[in-house]
Design a protein with these regions (language model features):
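S-adenosyl-L-methionine
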Residues: 1-42
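SAM-dependent methyltransferase catalytic-core segment centered on the flexible catalytic loop
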Residues: 14-19, 23-24, 40, 54-71, ...
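Conserved class I S-adenosyl-L-methionine
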Residues: 45-55
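The conserved SAM/SAH-binding core of class I Rossmann-like methyltransferase domains
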Residues: 75
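Conserved SAM/SAH-binding beta-strand->alpha-helix loop
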Residues: 78
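Conserved SAM-binding loop
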Residues: 85-86
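Conserved hydrophobic residues forming the short capping helix/wall of the S-adenosyl-L-methionine
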Residues: 89
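Short, conserved active-site loop motifs that form the nucleotide-linked donor/cofactor pocket
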Residues: 95
């Protein structure tokens, strides 16, 4: 299986490195995405999935190719990448894509599964400091400046 499929390859060619760095965009290799999707679908009762760092939707593309009746909600903060992703899910009624920071949204919804490869940057590099205090409040804990999205 190739490292990136055509969708990711085209995006990488068209988006500047500066833009991709700004949003900490590094794409999950298909073999790893497939492994993660297979693991998630090991739950026979899987009906709803959250993909909070949607990007181009590699996980959702794989999940829906295996189980087309899943209801998936995806979030991304980059309008450019979400615009590209929406082209590939056009007409897919089981997909809801949001141009929002999932860190501020969806706290009250529940999902059967969550799948993502969050952008890797430390909170001290994060430009929306109010997110940190909101997360600390909701989780009742203090995060240090070296915490990254993988921790959450």
């Amino acid at each position: 299986m190739e490292q990136l499929n055509n969708i990711e390859s085209i995006y990488v060619q068209n988006a500047t490195m500066e833009h991709r760095k700004q949003y900490a965009q590094f794409f999950t290799p298909l073999a790893i995405a497939q492994l993660m999707a297979d693991w998630l679908l090991g739950n026979d009762k899987m009906e709803t999935v959250l993909e909070p760092a949607f990007g181009l939707g590699v996980f959702s593309r794989i999940l829906l190719s295996i189980k087309s009746n899943l209801l998936i909600k995806g979030f991304d903060i980059d309008e450019m990448i979400l615009h590209e992703a929406k082209k590939h899910f056009e007409g897919c009624k089981s997909m809801k894509l949001m141009l929002q920071d999932y860190m501020f949204n969806d706290w009250n919804n529940k999902y059967d599964g969550i799948i993502c490869n969050p952008p890797y940057f430390k909170f001290h590099d994060y430009d929306n400091k109010s997110v940190i205090s909101e997360i600390e409040r909701k989780l009742s804990c203090k995060l240090n400046g070296f915490t990254n999205l993988y921790t959450l």
